Amino acid sequence: MITIDLAFSPASADLIDAADDEGTRSRLQEAGDWECELSAWIEALRQDHGNHCPEVVRTCDSLSLGISLLDDASIAELNLHWRQKPTPTDVLSFAALESEMPMVAGQELELGDIVVSVPTARRQALEQKHGLERELRWLVSHGLLHLLSWDHPDEDALAAMLQKQEHLLGMGSNVRS
């Protein structure tokens, strides 16, 4: 089983206070559930040789990544700086992996960072008629796939990515929909 070193930046107190249930509050302020779920997701992706999982990820023992849960203004600032889009977005991924990156035995592999807008996730959860916790998991799974070199330049690639996200979310977590 892979070891995950998660740098977790929780949501602000006002975003946590607005959460509807304890499970969602936990996801917004604690790293534990994320560490367990990311570990399971990455292990499943490493085992599935039919997907896009870089060889360096398949063979490493330990990796690190970050999750930051932000407000719309903060993610809009990042979106403007990195994508020249002056609006909030649901999730941004900042991948650290480069293709054919050499790996030293025993060295921790840095995947990158996933940044999620909690208010945007909340709006999308309402639109999709499911809970905020599920939407947060959906967005983090999407960000994780981007960190692992997945992309969606066309409809077929997007469909494959969305199907993989559904698979990851279906792996089992005690989530209220």
UniProtKB/Swiss-Prot annotation:
One of its GO terms (molecular function) is metalloendopeptidase activity. Binds 1 zinc ion. Its EC number is 3.1.-.-. The lineage of its organism: Bacteria, Bacillati, Cyanobacteriota, Cyanophyceae, Synechococcales. Belongs to the endoribonuclease YbeY family. Pfam families: YbeY. The keyword NAD does not apply. Single strand-specific metallo-endoribonuclease involved in late-stage 70S ribosome quality control and in maturation of the 3' terminus of the 16S rRNA. Its cofactor is Zn(2+). This is Endoribonuclease YbeY. Zn(2+) binds at residues 142, 146, 152.
